[in-house]
């Protein structure tokens, strides 16, 4: 057995190394095991008043009450724990055990930043986040500056020399952006396979094309249609832009989940967003402004929602506000870009069912842009309605925002339902009131028309005997159209049954009231599509398995004649100018100029003759394309014109001269197309002749090699035999042209 000296090689004292002197932090971090601590339902509230133990019970009860009133969350006093310092005073924060992790997430959303009193404001976090915050480096690291990359011009498509519109077509896995040509097929500008995983959508002004992906939303724009921005909302299925394209709202059926290693930044979700389904984004920067939960059904089953309708947020026309409905309780108005509640509280309205913002007309926009000090622009307005409750009648109310001033209200009786229809220029408001008789056995309809540009908003009532199934204002005019029906099968349609309807046109009479203009009976139409410029309207039958009718009407057909004859019948102005049919039609859309109509049959609805057709404003079919797996076609919207009133008047005045120029260009284009077709035919014919001559030479060479006679001699011999075997039969036909009788003496 060796001695100690031999083992230590003569060293008097063993030189052992202490484990405490070795840094194992990198190894521990690499091989650390994450345990499921089950503390997701525990939150930490900072900013709590410093107290002694004698005041603990009172503080807990106050916090319990605040959670109930502000966040509608029940917490138990027994679930609160507060640490104390050595001097007997609390440390300014408490731990709260919530009933579930979902309640903890809601508490973070609702109570973080809550002002407990003038000196204390809550800061709420998950207990599991404390360790993560503690491990953050205290050394500031300068973020890397991204290299500036200039953007392409986002409205370049408006500079097309021919003034053509664009459209996007989805077919199978391919997405195409194409120019619309009147006399030829769409000219493809951009085409990409698998550009989107579901469908596409244009922004309201046509600046961006939206595509949907599993990881989130992407928007594209510019001459090369490059990606402009990403919005990382996993599973997003619905998108809604604000009118000026400054903001965007997305919805996903999947609750937001934030993993522990999730990136941090203004464009990413944080712990306070967990469990939410709605997200609001700033389009230009991609920053997340706020997220909202969507109330689930009491059953708690996924996908079963109550009180949810799309769009979830409705935008004011100037993008300053957005609002959402809390059914039966209130309307919550939020200011942009902070997305904070207007005046920090919702507008309490008992029983509220629906609301709509008043659009901003051209007059209002011009006034707002001029910003004259002596003329104040019209405030934003919303209209909402409340149903009948006990002895309280139903009510329609117009309110100014942000002042919350009631501008007009009207009581309604025997109301079953209301639909709110603003005129696109904000001149009128039509409330379509579905009413029942006292016995509730039959239904009829009233139109309550508010004149919102007149003092005190006078109301005109238009009474109708039948139920109204569709209503639409003329965009730039004083007409409106509606579809009514007294068919007993209305409301309970069965497969294969077509509902009989009436088409009604109304106009503003010179005496100042709305009167019937013309009625068309025995129709099957169920939808109305006004031209964006007004005057023309398409009436269609959609959703039927038997009828696919399309009808084009002009509501100002006799305008020039009537100008010289004021006594002419106004009903003569409404004229059916075109009819058509698109088998299996599922969608219809006007182009932004009001010159063309696109109808389509999508594979999303059925698989019979999928494709699209292009019509002019008079109902003449210009193109029709049957395409397998066709999904969608959308016109690219255009922004509001940059021409002022005077410039627009000058254009209208010289319209005849411009029309001649356009007609010449159209004729030249058609001539070029015809010439191109002739050249193509001639080229194909020459190619065929060359192939025939080459094949004849090859055949003659082959026959010569085989010792047979030439092709020409063989053909002549065959002709001779055919002539000998042919029997010519002649048949004489006599026809009596005239017959006369003479009597001979």
From Swiss-Prot:
Q: Where in the cell is it found?
A: Cytoplasm
Q: Which residues form the RRM domain?
A: 41-129
Citing just one GO molecular function, the answer is: identical protein binding
| A GO cellular component annotation in the UniProt record | eukaryotic 43S preinitiation complex
Top-rank taxon of the source lineage equals Eukaryota
Q: What start-end ranges are recorded for coiled-coil regions in this protein?
A: 644-745
Q: Could you tell me what this protein is called? A: Eukaryotic translation initiation factor 3 subunit B
Q: Enumerate the InterPro entries for this protein.
A: EIF3B, eIF3B_RRM, Nucleotide-bd_a/b_plait_sf, RBD_domain_sf, RRM_dom, TIF_beta_prop-like, WD40/YVTN_repeat-like_dom_sf
Q: How does this polypeptide assemble, per the annotation?
A: Component of the eukaryotic translation initiation factor 3 (eIF-3) complex.
| Claim: RNA-binding is one of the keywords in the record | yes
Q: What does the sequence similarity comment in the record state about its family?
A: Belongs to the eIF-3 subunit B family.
> PROSITE patterns under this entry?
RRM
A UniProt-annotated Pfam family: eIF2A
Which controlled-vocabulary keywords does the entry list? Coiled coil, Cytoplasm, Initiation factor, Protein biosynthesis, Repeat, RNA-binding, WD repeat
Write out the GO biological process terms: formation of cytoplasmic translation initiation complex; translational initiation
Function as written in the Swiss-Prot or TrEMBL entry: RNA-binding component of the eukaryotic translation initiation factor 3 (eIF-3) complex, which is involved in protein synthesis of a specialized repertoire of mRNAs and, together with other initiation factors, stimulates binding of mRNA and methionyl-tRNAi to the 40S ribosome. The eIF-3 complex specifically targets and initiates translation of a subset of mRNAs involved in cell proliferation.
**What is the first-listed, main subcellular location in coarse terms?**
cytoplasm
Instruction: Tell me the ranges holding the WD repeats.
Output: 189-230, 251-293, 303-344, 580-625
């Amino acid at each position: 057995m060796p001695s100690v000296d031999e083992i230590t090689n003569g060293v008097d004292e063993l030189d052992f190394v202490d484990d405490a002197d070795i840094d194992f932090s990198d190894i521990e971090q690499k091989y650390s095991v994450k345990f499921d601590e089950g503390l997701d339902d525990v939150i930490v509230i900072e900013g709590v008043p410093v107290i002694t133990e004698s005041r603990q019970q009172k503080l807990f009860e106050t916090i319990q009450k605040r959670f109930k009133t502000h966040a509608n969350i029940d917490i138990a006093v027994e679930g609160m724990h507060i640490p104390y310092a050595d001097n007997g005073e609390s440390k300014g924060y408490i731990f709260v055990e919530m009933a579930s992790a979902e309640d903890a997430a809601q508490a973070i959303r609702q109570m973080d930043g809550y002002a407990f009193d003038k000196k204390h404001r809550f800061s709420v976090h998950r207990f599991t986040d404390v360790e993560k915050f503690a491990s953050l480096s205290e050394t500031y690291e300068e973020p890397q500056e991204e290299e500036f990359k200039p953007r392409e011009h986002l409205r370049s498509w408006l500079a097309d020399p021919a003034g053509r519109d664009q459209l996007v077509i989805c077919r199978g896995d391919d997405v195409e952006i194409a120019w619309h040509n009147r006399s030829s097929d769409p000219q493809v500008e951009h085409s990409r396979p698998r550009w989107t995983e579901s469908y596409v959508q244009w922004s309201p002004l046509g600046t961006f094309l939206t595509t949907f992906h599993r990881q989130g939303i992407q928007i594209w724009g510019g001459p090369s249609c490059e990606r402009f921005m990403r919005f990382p909302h996993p599973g997003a299925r619905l998108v809604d832009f604000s009118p000026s394209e400054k903001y965007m709202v997305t919805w996903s059926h999947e609750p937001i989940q934030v993993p522990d290693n999730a990136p941090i930044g203004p464009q990413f979700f944080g712990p306070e967003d967990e469990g939410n389904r709605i997200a609001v984004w700033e389009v230009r920067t991609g920053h997340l402004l706020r997220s909202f939960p969507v109330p689930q059904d009491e059953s708690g089953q996924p996908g079963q929602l109550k009180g949810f309708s799309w769009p979830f947020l409705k935008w004011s026309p100037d993008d300053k506000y957005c609002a959402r409905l809390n059914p039966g309780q209130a309307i919550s108005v939020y200011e942009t870009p902070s997305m904070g509640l207007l005046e920090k509280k919702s507008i309490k309205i008992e029983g509220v069912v629906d609301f709509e913002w008043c659009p901003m007309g051209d007059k209002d926009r011009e006034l707002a842009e001029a910003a004259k000090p002596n003329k104040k622009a019209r405030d934003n307005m919303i209209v909402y309605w409340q149903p009948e409750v006990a002895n309280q009648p139903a009510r329609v109310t117009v309110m100014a925002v942000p002042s919350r001033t009631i501008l007009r209200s009207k009581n309604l009786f025997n109301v079953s339902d209301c639909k709110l229809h603003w005129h696109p220029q904000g001149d009128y408001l039509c409330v379509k009131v579905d009413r029942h008789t006292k016995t509730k056995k039959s239904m009829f309809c009233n139109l309550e028309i508010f004149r919102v540009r007149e003092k005190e908003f006078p109301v005109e009532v238009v009474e109708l005997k039948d139920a109204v199934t569709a209503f639409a204002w003329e965009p730039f005019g004083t007409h409106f159209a509606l579809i009514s029906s007294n068919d007993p099968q209305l409301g309970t349609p069965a497969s294969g049954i077509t509902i009989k309807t009436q088409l009604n046109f109304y106009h503003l009479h010179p005496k100042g009231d709305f009167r019937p203009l013309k009625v068309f009976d025995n129709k099957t139409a169920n939808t109305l599509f006004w031209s964006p410029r007004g005057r023309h309207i398409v009436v269609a039958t959609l959703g039927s398995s038997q009828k696919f009718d399309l009808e084009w009407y002009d509501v100002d057909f006799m305008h020039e004649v009537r100008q010289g004859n004021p006594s002419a019948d106004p009903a003569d102005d409404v004229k059916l100018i075109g009819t058509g049919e698109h088998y299996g039609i599922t969608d219809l859309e006007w182009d932004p100029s009001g010159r063309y109509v696109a109808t389509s049959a999508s594979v999303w609805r059925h698989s019979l003759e999928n494709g699209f057709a292009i019509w002019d404003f008079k109902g003449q079919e210009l193109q029709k394309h049957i395409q397998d797996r066709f999904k969608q076609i959308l016109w690219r919207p255009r922004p509001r014109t940059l021409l002022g009133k005077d410039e627009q008047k000058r254009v209208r005045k010289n319209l005849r001269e411009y029309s001649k120029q356009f007609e010449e260009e159209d004729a030249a284009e058609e001539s070029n197309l015809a010439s191109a077709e002739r050249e193509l035919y001639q080229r194909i014919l020459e190619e065929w002749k060359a192939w025939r001559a080459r094949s004849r030479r090859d055949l003659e060479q082959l026959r010569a090699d085989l010792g047979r006679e030439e092709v020409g001699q063989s053909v002549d011999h065959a002709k001779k035999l055919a002539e000998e075997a042919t029997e010519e039969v002649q048949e004489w036909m006599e026809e009596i042209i005239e017959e006369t009788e003479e009597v001979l003496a």
